[in-house]
C-alpha cells in the first residue's frame, strides 16, 4: 500500500513538473521583469498594487498559455532537436489534448484577469501579442520564413507595453518607444540562440537566418540590430520618460554588448562560444534597463496617440 502510494505521489509530481515545463518558466520570469518595468515606468511612483499584481499574474498566464500551445504545435520539430526532444509533448508523458486544454484554460484565466482589472488597451495588446505568437509565428512563420524571428519579435515586445498601458490606458510615445526597444532587442538575442543552436535548427529545417542565409549575414544583423537598439533606448531619457541614470545604464550596456558583438568578426572566433556570450549579455542588458526604468522614471506629460475606453 505504501509502495503504491509513493508511486502515485511520484507520478503526480512528474505530471506537475511536466505541466510547469510546457509553460517555459524562464520565458515567464523574463516577461515578468519587463512587465514590471513598463508598469513602474508609467506609474511614476504612484503604484496601485492590486493593478500591478493583476497585470503581472494576468500576463504571466497569457504567456504561459502561448508557450503551452506552442509546445503542442512544435511537437514534430521538437522531436528533431536535441534541446527539445525530451519535452512532454514529444515523449507523450502528458497527452497532447491535456496540454492543449491546459493552455486554453490558463489563457482564458489570464485574459479574464486582464479584462477585469486593467483596461481595453492593455487587453488589446495582450491579445495581439498572443495571436501573433501562436497564430502567425508558431503555426506558419517559424517553419516557413526567414522573417519568422522578425514577426516573433513583436509578440516578445508586448509585455512591457501591456504593463505600461495598464497604468496609462493610452498609447503614447513612451509605449511606442518600449515597443520598438524590446522588438529590436529580440532580434540579436534570437539570432545568437540560432547560432549556438545551429545544428538543432538545421536538423529541424527551421529557416532561421544563420541556417537559411549563413553565419556571416547573421553576424551583420546582430551588430546592426544592437546598434539601432542602443539608439532607440536613448529615446526614453531624451523624451523625458527616464533620467540620467537610465541614460548611463543604456549607454554602458549597449556599448559593451555592441563591442562583444563586433568580436564575432575575428578570424579565430569560436562561433558557438561567442554567440552564447552575446545571448547571455542580452539578458543582462534588458534586465538592467527594465530595473532602471522602474526606478529612474520622470514626470512627463504626453498627448496620447490613441486611447481605448473600457
Curated annotation (Swiss-Prot):
<feature type="transmembrane region" description="Helical">
    <location>
        <begin position="25"/>
        <end position="45"/>
    </location>
</feature>
<dbReference type="GO" id="GO:0008495">
    <property type="term" value="F:protoheme IX farnesyltransferase activity"/>
</dbReference>
<dbReference type="GO" id="GO:0005886">
    <property type="term" value="C:plasma membrane"/>
</dbReference>
<keyword id="KW-1133">Transmembrane helix</keyword>
<feature type="transmembrane region" description="Helical">
    <location>
        <begin position="245"/>
        <end position="265"/>
    </location>
</feature>
<dbReference type="GO" id="GO:0048034">
    <property type="term" value="P:heme O biosynthetic process"/>
</dbReference>
<keyword id="KW-0997">Cell inner membrane</keyword>
<feature type="transmembrane region" description="Helical">
    <location>
        <begin position="121"/>
        <end position="141"/>
    </location>
</feature>
<dbReference type="InterPro" id="IPR000537">
    <property type="entry name" value="UbiA_prenyltransferase"/>
</dbReference>
<keyword id="KW-1003">Cell membrane</keyword>
<dbReference type="InterPro" id="IPR030470">
    <property type="entry name" value="UbiA_prenylTrfase_CS"/>
</dbReference>
<comment type="function">
    <text>Converts heme B (protoheme IX) to heme O by substitution of the vinyl group on carbon 2 of heme B porphyrin ring with a hydroxyethyl farnesyl side group.</text>
</comment>
<comment type="similarity">
    <text>Belongs to the UbiA prenyltransferase family. Protoheme IX farnesyltransferase subfamily.</text>
</comment>
<feature type="transmembrane region" description="Helical">
    <location>
        <begin position="222"/>
        <end position="242"/>
    </location>
</feature>
<dbReference type="InterPro" id="IPR006369">
    <property type="entry name" value="Protohaem_IX_farnesylTrfase"/>
</dbReference>
<keyword id="KW-0350">Heme biosynthesis</keyword>
<feature type="transmembrane region" description="Helical">
    <location>
        <begin position="49"/>
        <end position="69"/>
    </location>
</feature>
<dbReference type="InterPro" id="IPR044878">
    <property type="entry name" value="UbiA_sf"/>
</dbReference>
<keyword id="KW-0472">Membrane</keyword>
<feature type="transmembrane region" description="Helical">
    <location>
        <begin position="176"/>
        <end position="196"/>
    </location>
</feature>
<comment type="pathway">
    <text>Porphyrin-containing compound metabolism; heme O biosynthesis; heme O from protoheme: step 1/1.</text>
</comment>
<feature type="transmembrane region" description="Helical">
    <location>
        <begin position="98"/>
        <end position="118"/>
    </location>
</feature>
<keyword id="KW-0808">Transferase</keyword>
<keyword id="KW-0812">Transmembrane</keyword>
<feature type="transmembrane region" description="Helical">
    <location>
        <begin position="277"/>
        <end position="297"/>
    </location>
</feature>
<feature type="transmembrane region" description="Helical">
    <location>
        <begin position="145"/>
        <end position="165"/>
    </location>
</feature>
<protein>
    <recommendedName>
        <fullName>Protoheme IX farnesyltransferase 2</fullName>
        <ecNumber>2.5.1.141</ecNumber>
    </recommendedName>
</protein>
<dbReference type="Pfam" id="PF01040">
    <property type="entry name" value="UbiA"/>
</dbReference>
Amino acid at each position: 500500500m505504501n509502495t503504491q502510494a509513493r508511486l502515485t505521489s511520484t507520478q503526480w509530481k512528474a505530471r506537475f513538473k511536466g505541466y510547469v515545463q510546457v509553460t517555459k518558466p524562464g520565458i515567464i520570469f523574463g516577461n515578468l521583469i519587463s512587465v514590471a518595468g513598463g508598469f513602474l515606468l508609467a506609474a511614476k511612483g504612484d503604484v496601485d498594487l492590486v493593478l500591478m499584481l493583476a497585470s503581472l499574474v494576468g500576463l504571466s498566464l497569457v504567456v504561459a498559455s502561448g508557450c503551452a500551445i506552442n509546445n503542442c504545435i512544435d511537437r514534430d520539430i521538437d522531436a528533431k532537436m536535441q534541446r527539445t526532444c525530451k519535452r512532454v509533448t514529444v515523449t507523450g508523458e502528458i497527452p497532447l489534448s491535456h496540454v492543449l486544454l491546459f493552455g486554453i484554460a490558463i489563457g482564458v484565466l489570464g485574459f479574464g484577469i486582464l479584462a477585469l482589472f486593467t483596461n481595453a488597451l492593455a487587453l488589446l495588446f495582450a491579445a495581439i501579442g498572443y495571436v501573433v505568437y501562436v497564430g502567425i509565428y508558431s503555426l506558419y512563420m517559424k517553419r516557413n520564413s526567414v522573417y519568422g524571428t522578425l514577426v516573433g519579435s513583436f509578440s516578445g515586445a508586448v509585455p512591457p507595453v501591456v504593463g505600461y498601458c495598464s497604468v496609462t490606458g493610452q498609447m503614447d510615445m513612451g509605449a511606442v518607444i518600449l515597443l520598438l526597444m524590446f522588438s529590436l532587442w529580440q532580434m540579436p538575442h534570437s539570432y545568437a540562440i540560432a547560432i549556438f543552436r545551429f545544428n538543432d535548427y538545421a536538423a529541424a529545417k527551421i529557416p532561421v537566418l544563420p541556417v537559411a542565409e549563413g553565419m556571416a549575414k547573421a553576424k551583420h544583423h546582430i551588430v546592426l540590430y544592437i546598434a539601432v537598439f542602443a539608439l532607440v533606448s536613448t529615446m526614453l531619457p531624451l523624451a523625458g520618460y527616464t533620467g540620467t541614470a537610465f541614460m548611463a545604464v543604456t549607454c554602458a550596456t549597449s556599448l559593451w554588448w555592441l563591442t562583444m558583438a563586433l568580436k564575432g568578426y575575428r578570424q579565430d572566433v569560436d562561433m558557438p562560444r561567442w554567440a552564447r556570450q552575446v545571448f547571455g549579455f542580452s539578458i543582462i542588458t534588458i534586465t538592467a534597463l527594465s530595473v532602471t526604468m522602474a526606478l529612474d522614471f520622470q514626470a512627463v506629460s504626453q498627448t496620447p496617440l490613441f486611447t481605448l475606453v473600457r
